[in-house]
UniProtKB/Swiss-Prot annotation:
Its cofactor is Zn(2+). It catalyses: hydrogencarbonate + H(+) = CO2 + H2O. Substrate binds at T203, T204. This is Carbonic anhydrase. Homodimer. Reversible hydration of carbon dioxide. It holds the Pfam family Carb_anhydrase. InterPro entries: Alpha_CA_prokaryot-like (IPR041891), CA_dom (IPR001148), CA_dom_sf (IPR036398), Carbonic_anhydrase_a-class (IPR023561), Carbonic_anhydrase_a-class_CS (IPR018338). It comes from Neisseria gonorrhoeae. Its main location: periplasm. SMART domains: Carb_anhydrase. The keyword rRNA-binding does not apply. GO terms for cellular component: periplasmic space.
Length: 252
């Protein structure tokens, strides 16, 4: 099923770093970047020395998953629970923040704590050249601050009621609100957690590498009105183009 047609102008994305909770905190910079014009993804590597990896990195994300290598990938064990969260419009995405721990994902004997999840419209990763209407990134860190991103792709379809509590309160300008009841992130994951795995990077500046990527094979759905509301809130589509795989291998 094709992605939704563009119905909104690509406006200049506003300043505010933090599409991933740890990137802005770790680098402490305030360089303007966005998805359109002079601040677009093609220019990120030239905006700041700290962003240089966006241009020079060899293990960048997102990617187009075409050829894969079969492997006995370990099962993902998710231990998410209802938690109080903030819903933030940081100018680049709508992000749901987890101020406290307690939500974890374990894979291959290593446990990662969920820090936040956010969305990209349209998707950043592709499957055999196919772009999806939306993608969610569940961002985790292990005890050594090593990042893992669990990605869910959304097809065009009917309204996704499981997103309603977030979509109903999402700030339409920069800012954040607290949900008035606990939110269980596991409701946004499919029952089957089969996945593709590859080494990659943050998909936003500073494009730090060393990120473990798990892209789920089972898709969710979203309707056009939900996608359009997101794009209005953020001010533009917010997907980085796919990057070369180079010597990397995608395992499934």
């Amino acid at each position: 099923m094709p992605r939704f047609p563009r119905t909104l102008p690509r406006l200049t994305a506003v300043l505010l770093l933090a599409c991933t909770a740890f990137s802005a905190a770790a680098h402490g910079n305030h360089t303007h970047w966005g998805y359109t014009g002079h601040d677009s993804p093609e220019s990120w590597g030239n905006l700041s020395e700290e962003f240089r990896l966006c241009s020079t990195g060899k293990n960048q994300s997102p990617v187009n998953i075409t050829e894969t290598v079969s492997g006995k990938l370990p099962a993902i064990k998710v231990n998410y629970k209802p938690s109080m969260v903030d819903v933030e419009n940081n100018g680049h995405t709508i992000q749901v923040n987890y101020p406290e721990g307690g939500n974890t994902l374990t894979v291959n004997g290593r446990t990662y704590t969920l820090k936040q999840f956010h969305f990209h419209v349209p998707s950043e990763n592709q499957i055999k050249g196919r772009t999806f209407p939306m993608e969610a990134h569940f961002v985790h860190l292990d005890e050594n601050k090593q990042p893992l991103v669990l990605a869910v792709l959304y097809e065009a379809g009917k309204t996704n009621g499981r997103l309603s509590s977030i979509w109903n309160v999402m700030p339409m300008t920069a800012g954040k609100v607290k949900l008035n009841q606990p939110f269980d992130a596991s409701t946004l994951l499919p029952k089957r957690l089969k996945y593709y795995r590859f080494a990659g990077s943050l998909t936003t500046p500073p494009c730090t590498e060393g990120v473990s990527w798990l892209v789920l094979k089972t898709y969710d759905h979203i309707d056009q009105a939900q996608a359009e509301k997101f794009t209005r809130a953020v001010g533009s589509e917010n997907n980085r183009p796919v990057q070369p795989l180079n010597a990397r291998v995608v395992i499934e």
